[in-house]
UniProtKB/Swiss-Prot annotation:
GO terms for molecular function: acetaldehyde dehydrogenase (acetylating) activity; NAD binding. This is Acetaldehyde dehydrogenase. Belongs to the acetaldehyde dehydrogenase family. It catalyses: acetaldehyde + NAD(+) + CoA = acetyl-CoA + NADH + H(+).
Length: 305
């Protein structure tokens, strides 16, 4: 594709890395995928990449570091692995878009702060639950202060690969922190449930938000519906299953009107089954964030020319 694109690589040839590969090939935008690197030479992801003409390696991060032309790296490995990767990528001046809960860089949720950290060399996409639910908490907090937000993400057990299962503890901490830092809640709590039901269920999320004071329910409802429409621009299967509910409850902060929103995420079916909306929203968010970084790198290149 030449000088009109930014060369990118994917670290991790599991479910998330492979699905992201399909998204980047189908809608490359300003990016050119030049490498999919994993550590299992027999992984399905590497085999699929080779069949599609994408360069592959089973040498992990080492293969990326050998390619100086790669400017953006999507890390779809694990939180523990990314801690090491982040240091190496930073030392070589690569932009890391972290799809693990390692959180070595600032959080990014596209409909909330897509362009806020374009000078960072490492940004974190929090978790699938964070990408799905933080926009709704933010939608409430931009109308009225939120003293507490709690989310419950239920995903199909079959959609949770080894990386997801290794990251369960980091998921709860990082998502809860994201509810506060990006969502705007004074206190956040996150719960994830792996549901073994057959046939597998779609990703389902319950969001509770307790406003600190009085508010106009119509404004909150409109704010939620507006941000859902924003997310649907890059995750078409993202939708509310019912209109937001407002009901009075006894809470640790006194008797308050609690906002409850129910949503589900259906995947696009690029590589993963449509029930794996939890993984699809991560890869869709990653592609969106990567495109913004790539456009900025290209604009800087034009200025230098």
């Amino acid at each position: 594709m030449g000088d009109e694109t930014i060369k990118v690589a994917i670290l991790g040839s599991g479910n998330i890395g492979t699905d992201l590969m399909y998204k980047l090939l189908d809608h490359p935008g300003s990016m050119e995928l030049v490498l999919l690197a994993g550590i299992d030479p027999h992984s399905e992801g590497l085999a699929r990449a080779r069949s599609l003409g994408v360069a592959t390696s089973d040498q992990g991060i080492a293969a990326v570091l050998e390619r100086p032309e790669i400017q953006i790296v999507f890390d779809a490995t694990s939180a523990k692995a990314h801690v090491r990767h982040a240091k190496l990528l930073h030392e070589t001046g690569r932009i890391a878009i972290d799809l693990t809960p390692a959180a070595r860089g600032p959080y990014v949720v596209p409909p909330v702060n897509l362009t806020q950290h374009l000078d960072a060399l490492n940004v974190n996409l929090i978790t699938c639950g964070g990408q799905a639910t933080i926009p709704l908490v933010y939608a409430v907090s931009r109308v009225t202060p939120v003293c507490y937000a709690e989310i419950v993400s239920t995903v199909a057990s079959r959609s949770a690969g080894p990386g997801t299962r290794q990251n369960i503890d980091e998921f709860t901490f990082t998502t809860a922190h994201g509810l506060e830092v990006i969502g705007g809640a004074q206190q956040g709590k996150a719960i994830i449930i792996l549901n073994p039901a057959e046939p597998p269920i779609l990703m389902r999320n319950t969001v509770y938000a307790i406003p600190a004071g009085d508010f106009d329910p119509a404004q909150v409802r409109d704010s939620i519906e507006a941000i859902v429409a924003e997310v649907q621009q890059y995750v078409p299967g993202y939708r509310l299953t019912n209109p937001p509910v407002f009901n009075m409850r006894e809470t640790p902060w006194g008797r308050k009107p609690v906002v409850t929103a129910l949503l589900e995420v259906e995947g696009a079916g690029h590589f993963l089954p449509t029930y794996a909306g939890n993984l699809d929203i991560m890869t869709a968010s990653a592609r969106r964030v990567g495109e913004v970084f790539a456009q900025q790198l290209l604009s800087r290149r034009e200025v230098l020319v």
